[in-house]
């Protein structure tokens, strides 16, 4: 199969990370994959083995996902959006994919709906129409009004052959965060969680005995980092390593540094996952990929869900993890250095949680589902 995955990450890098993991699973089974990314470059993420196409990049203005900024930080104008659409159209015509996958859309990225509609209409007009799938995480941002769900249903009905829900239905079903109509239910395929291969310990033991603080690969998390810098003063027996994401990480590290704190600050690093099994504990938000890393590694963890701008996705996910051993959840608004230290002491003294019981092979299952649906379409 020739597969095109289209993704635009606007704040963090989780959507791109998941799209790349999904793409690698297709490659590993002998298929050709192109990932078209419309977000800003994320050098900490590997694109090895994939064809990678960078569109003119966009990012959100903080948590305002309706206000999109271009590569220079200005509000993206019509010409910029037109350049993105033209880039995608040229790529589609060149590749003539067998399978087209849109990450998150039409359940999100409404601010890019003209771009996606143009792509989907062009795909329908190809000499051989591709199988069209939507790829979504376990928990979505619930629609703020019924029309948003109705619009998504209309797009699914018009253009899509299936919806890949990257969740284990024993843990979380789509209706936890999104109204599932009869039409949508008929196109949903649960894949299990899309996770990279199981976490393997760092060959040099990096992170051993440390408290690792992270907030994903985007430019958020300064309040969490600052709290950790101060909390490190109260727990000097542990090395606190704070991994700062975003393209401006170096500047923010300078701003966050406190010479009276023993905390170590450095940019987010690509070997972060391999450090987790060695760590004494993790302090992080609760994005999809972070949650899977923690479930796979078994590392004790304090979760501080990202909840700015009416975001509820991470809070819902954290709530589902809270009953498991070795997890504590602290609301961002209530977080203080003292509360963070208390939560860390709690999770580090908790019983070791089992690494079994969750389906982590969602990428492989997605390939199988796509192949089956394509075979049925072309039979």
Language model feature labels by segment:
Residues 23, 178, 193-281, 333:
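Donor-nucleotide binding loops and adjacent catalytic segments primarily
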Residues 89-158:
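Conserved nucleotide-sugar donor-interacting segment of glycosyltransferase catalytic cores
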Residues 1-12, 102-104:
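Nucleotide-activated donor-dependent transferases that construct or modify glycoconjugates
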Residues 271-315:
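A donor-sugar binding/catalytic signature common to diverse glycosyltransferases
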Residues 341-379:
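C-terminal amphipathic helix plus adjacent low-complexity
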Residues 7-18, 221-222:
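A short, glycine/small-residue-rich beta-strand->loop->alpha-helix junction that serves as a flexible
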